[in-house]
């Protein structure tokens, strides 16, 4: 379960950076619009599956699936989840999606899991968060991009999430 450990480490890193006093606020509509643009651009591509869920549309089921990796406290405040899964996409589409993730560097605070931005098995991983209250550990937007042998996806969560060290 390398991905599970990766996500846990990412949540802990977000907590550590936030406790250092790095407050970073941004307009949510700009972030949501960037995610919607990526979904619209790649949803019809072969090998790419996009899904957005909100309350009443299966959000609780998605939270249950992510609970082990993200933690119950973190997911409690999530109001929407967008998942872009591209495990069956062509190499060109995978590379294009990696480049699309760069848009978040100007919108959110980036948290690297490793200095080389690579997972132990040679994959690619990046995490981003919009910190709204560093002292309380509150995040309004959270993006995680994973491209490894096990999983290729971009997950975007919005809401009022609380990051606690595990």
Where does each model-flagged region fall?
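Short Gly/Thr-rich strand-loop-strand
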Residues: 98-134
């Amino acid at each position: 379960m390398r991905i599970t450990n990766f996500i846990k480490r990412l949540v802990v890193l977000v907590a550590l950076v936030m406790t250092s006093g790095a407050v970073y606020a941004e307009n949510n509509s700009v972030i949501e619009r960037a995610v919607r643009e990526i979904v619209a651009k790649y949803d019809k591509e072969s090998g790419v599956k996009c899904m957005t869920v909100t309350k009443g549309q299966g959000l609780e089921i998605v939270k249950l699936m992510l609970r082990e990796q993200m933690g119950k406290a973190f997911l409690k405040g999530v109001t929407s989840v967008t998942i872009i899964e591209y495990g069956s996409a062509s190499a060109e589409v995978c590379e294009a999606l990696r480049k699309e993730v760069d848009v978040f560097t100007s919108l959110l605070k980036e948290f690297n899991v490793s200095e080389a931005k690579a997972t132990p098995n040679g994959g690619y991983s990046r995490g981003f968060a919009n910190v709204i209250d560093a002292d309380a550990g509150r995040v309004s937007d959270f993006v995680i991009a994973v491209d490894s042998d096990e999983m290729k996806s971009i997950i975007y969560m919005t809401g009022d999430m609380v990051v606690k060290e595990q």
